[in-house]
Curated annotation (Swiss-Prot):
GO terms for cellular component: chloroplast; large ribosomal subunit. It is found in: Plastid, Chloroplast. The keyword Plastid applies. Belongs to the bacterial ribosomal protein bL32 family. Pfam families: Ribosomal_L32p. This is Large ribosomal subunit protein bL32c. The keyword Ribonucleoprotein applies. GO terms for molecular function: structural constituent of ribosome. Keywords: Chloroplast, Plastid, Ribonucleoprotein, Ribosomal protein. Its main location: plastid. The gene is rpl32.
Length: 54
């Protein structure tokens, strides 16, 4: 089994953690943007079937 030889420095750990957080933030922004465009009806990539409740 592979074992790391030295301890990872705090700065390197912080950099990796921030990269990981930024990826999540970007995914959340995309999801929010897609949700907004679907709710307003301005989405060009999705077709939402409208149901008439009358």
């Amino acid at each position: 089994m592979a074992v790391p030889k030295k301890r990872t420095s705090i700065s390197k750990k912080r950099i990796r953690k921030n990269i990981w957080k930024r990826k999540g933030y970007g995914a959340a922004l995309k999801a929010l943007s897609l949700g907004k465009s679907l709710s307003t009806g301005s989405s060009k990539s999705f077709f939402v079937r409208q149901t008439n409740k009358s």
